[in-house]
């Protein structure tokens, strides 16, 4: 059983997946910072300083000064502002991943195009062709 596990874990797909998960976790931190530190202030500038993450509705009917106050009071809360921020985070992540994939595909296509261009160039005469030409030239002389 241990040998089977070693075989499974040493396969390329598992290692690629592990690297992807680690990079994804780091990427999530970067995107979260991008949204919190750059996008939210920009959105707040155009919305008059509104912070979406503070938008909520207390389901117990009471009025609370903030989302933190409502959750501290133990009130059931519909925190739709957090959902809005999660959607914004998702859209930014999806856009960045789209741009990365598009860039990688463009680079791959360019590399494949260069390979095809090299393959399409007419090849010079082969050794056999040269030997045939020499044979024919010698036959004409002698």
UniProtKB/Swiss-Prot annotation:
GO molecular function terms listed in the Swiss-Prot or TrEMBL record: mechanosensitive monoatomic ion channel activity
Database matches in InterPro entries: Mechanosensitive_channel_CS (IPR019823), MS_channel (IPR001185), MSC/AndL (IPR037673), MscL_channel (IPR036019)
PROSITE patterns: MSCL
Compartments where located: Cell inner membrane
Any one Gene Ontology cellular component term annotated for this protein: plasma membrane
Pfam family, one: MscL
Keywords (A to Z) from UniProt: Cell inner membrane, Cell membrane, Ion channel, Ion transport, Membrane, Transmembrane, Transmembrane helix, Transport
TM stretches of this protein: 19-39, 41-61, 78-98
Family membership noted in the UniProt record: Belongs to the MscL family.
Subunit structure as annotated in this protein's UniProt entry: Homopentamer.
Function description: Channel that opens in response to stretch forces in the membrane lipid bilayer. May participate in the regulation of osmotic pressure changes within the cell.
Xref: HAMAP family: MscL
Name of this protein: Large-conductance mechanosensitive channel
Species this chain originates from: Roseobacter denitrificans (strain ATCC 33942 / OCh 114)
Lineage, top ranks: Bacteria, Pseudomonadati, Pseudomonadota, Alphaproteobacteria, Rhodobacterales
């Amino acid at each position: 059983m241990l040998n089977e596990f070693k075989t499974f874990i040493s396969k390329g797909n598992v290692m690629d997946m592990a690297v992807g998960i680690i990079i994804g976790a780091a990427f999530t931190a970067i995107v979260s910072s991008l949204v919190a530190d750059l996008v939210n202030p920009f959105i707040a500038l155009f919305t008059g300083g509104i912070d979406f993450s503070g938008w909520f509705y207390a389901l117990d009917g009471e009025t609370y000064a903030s989302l933190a106050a409502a959750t501290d009071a133990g009130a059931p809360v519909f925190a739709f502002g957090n959902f809005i921020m999660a959607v914004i985070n998702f859209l930014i992540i999806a856009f960045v991943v789209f741009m990365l994939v598009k860039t990688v595909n463009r680079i791959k296509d360019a590399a494949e195009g260069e390979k095809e261009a090299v393959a399409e160039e007419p090849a010079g005469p082969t050794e056999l062709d040269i030997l045939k030409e020499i044979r024919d030239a010698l036959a004409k002389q002698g």
